[in-house]
Amino acid sequence: MHVQSQASSDDFFLQGVGSADPAVAEILAGELKRQQDQIELIASENIVSKAVLDAQGSVLTNKYAEGYPGKRYYGGCEVVDEVERLAIERAKQLFGCEHANVQPHSGSQANQAVFMVTMTPGDTFMGMNLDHGGHLTHGKSVNQSGKWFSPVAYGVRAQDHLIDYDEAYEVAKANNPKVIIAGGSAYSRHIDFKKFREIADEVGAILMCDVAHYAGLIVAGEYPNPFPHAHIVTTTTHKTLRGPRGGMILTNDKKLAKKIDSAVFPGLQGGPLMHVIAAKAVAFGEALKPEFKQYARQVIENARALAESLQSVGFKIVSNGTDSHLMLVDLTPKGVSGADAEIALERAGITTNKNSIPGDPLPPMQTSGLRVGTPAGTTRGFGPGEFRQVGKWIGEVLDAVASGEDPTPVEQKVRGEVLALTKRFPIYS
């Protein structure tokens, strides 16, 4: 008598998560509702297309493919080779470069792979101070980059919070770093990659540009391109690029390209996530369309509208504005910590993240600032008018918190108005 196994039954291949696992389905539905009903201002988040979701949830999740197209350690890779080659070609076209590795699982792992190529433990490198807008992987002591290597930092000028290139030059001259990192996670202004290359050449360093936050703006021509100045570029594929969560490494140097590929696999990772690479290919294809250029322009226009609105209700904006998708809000005039602001705004239906500001006297889990951004709101259709209103709501909520009175009535009022706005701009409906 033939007995069907679970894996060969119709239910296994046809049953969706709703009937197969109601507990997980309920959680997924809850997250969908949260995203639909809240205004997402976290600068590192975005909303992907249905096409990207479809690719990431595809049968490619079944396939192991250690190695690279045409040079795999497994059979049956002829189809996944096609999608990885497509992702690579689209990435090269977007950035105008000669080589792209689309396998890194994250931006952090992309950075780790570059460190493996360019340094040995104990070597010195230079990155932006985390409190001034840098990133954890640029030398923070709690991160691998700070534990294995010897980081030195440059920062921003006290008077205008713009990158202090003179300081960067002096720090580089004094320390002779092997690598200089240009880029950050909370720096809102243009970065002069040409000037960083000049500093790198002066001290014989490799210039690594981490453009994780700016990638979508770069490929749309709305933010300076690190090429031809960078030796190596790392990025995430989400954020402003509006793809799946993942990483990527780019270069024009053939010798570095070969070393980078070896560092990613087998040096750092095993099998690549082919379903994610397929989703990257889809997102890169979207970014090559004229509509994406319009989107990137709108992201920046919206960010400037939000910054102006926040200033109009009494907030300081670090560097007094933005050239990109994000801004740092200095909360000290309101006497509210970033942690308290984040919690109150979430109760009101607005999602942000606490963030240190230059010279911040508060610890990282409290902070004197908020980081806010416009990519997700722009994706769902918000324009300057909507973002000006969002700025006013932030002012209302945080003024209520600062007053010392119970902020609940104001939070609930704003929550209702936020919900009405999000209903006008639905996602995945």
Swiss-Prot record:
What cofactor does its activity depend on? pyridoxal 5'-phosphate
Source species of the chain: Phenylobacterium zucineum (strain HLK1)
| Name of the protein | Serine hydroxymethyltransferase
Query: What's in the keyword line of the UniProt record?
Result: Amino-acid biosynthesis, Cytoplasm, One-carbon metabolism, Pyridoxal phosphate, Transferase
Give a GO molecular function annotation for the protein: pyridoxal phosphate binding
- Any one Gene Ontology biological process term? glycine biosynthetic process from serine
PANTHER family, alphabetized: SERINE HYDROXYMETHYLTRANSFERASE (PTHR11680), SERINE HYDROXYMETHYLTRANSFERASE 1 (PTHR11680:SF35)
The root-end lineage is: Bacteria, Pseudomonadati, Pseudomonadota, Alphaproteobacteria, Caulobacterales
User: EC number(s) in its UniProt entry?
Assistant: 2.1.2.1
Q: What is its main location?
A: cytoplasm
Matching Gene3D superfamilies, A to Z?
Aspartate Aminotransferase, domain 1, Type I PLP-dependent aspartate aminotransferase-like (Major domain)
